[in-house]
């Protein structure tokens, strides 16, 4: 049990809301369909969680082999700030690369079994979606594609945790997917992309040293990076507004609009970072849960985590609000 807890923690379970909440939102959207069933939905959700943990460990494993950890140390030694948490458990001797590989394979194997169970119940589309997710997840940092090193990693994450995950979850829960899930999953995918994109902007120096061509680095100029921050933060709300305007989505989907200040803060704070402007890193109630922020501050991680946590919480609240909307609509209609 202690070993399992160790690997769950080091697989960055703090990031699980970016997969669990979109999955639950998809289940809430599936609940109105006549063939809805809880048990394949729960099996699929379990598989999604295991896959997410496995992919995070895969990212650590391939980055470690790519010498990304040493690159981050070099950047820090040169006086630049960078996010230094990757593979600390290997650096400290708590685990070996071989043990990391075994843990990664174990999580992904369990996810594969869960996918197989849902495939048996729902049919071949589940197998296609599961295999596509596995291929993209491994290819994020792994050979031969190494998408995260060629400027496509952030976009791949958005596809995986947006349309691919949500369409798959709705199909697992009810055996079909509808037009609404396409609209909503596109919006969610952009917000998930925003989490890893913001991370990449904050880690530009370390990624450059490691030779990791993230999408943020591919854009090159501060203006382009800031423009895409605006796109990833604001387009999700625009998608829902258009969906309501053309009659594809119920007007209640606009209940997410009060979350806009979180998006505006992220754009503002990334602009400050790109322009080397000092801003206060003080949590506010509307930013959502911030964990032990004083601890982050003592470890000089407040500058990174306040932005990352706001981006994560934005996805969480966006999905929670829409899930509640769907439950209420199902009860009313």
Residue ranges and their predicted role:
Residues 21-26, 155-170, 217-221, 285-295, ...:
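Small-residue-rich segments of transmembrane alpha-helices in multi-pass membrane proteins
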Residues 27-46, 112-128, 165-186, 240-253, ...:
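Helix-coil boundary and interhelical linker segments in multi-pass alpha-helical membrane proteins
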Residues 24, 33-58, 70, 126-138, ...:
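Membrane-embedded alpha-helical segments that form the functional core of polytopic membrane enzymes
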Residues 1-43, 47, 55, 145, ...:
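Topogenic membrane-insertion module of multi-pass membrane proteins
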Residues 72-120, 216-247, 295, 299-319:
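Multi-pass membrane catalytic core of lipid/isoprenoid biosynthesis enzymes
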Residues 48-80, 194-216, 221, 225:
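Acidic (Asp/Glu-rich) catalytic motifs at the cytosolic membrane interface
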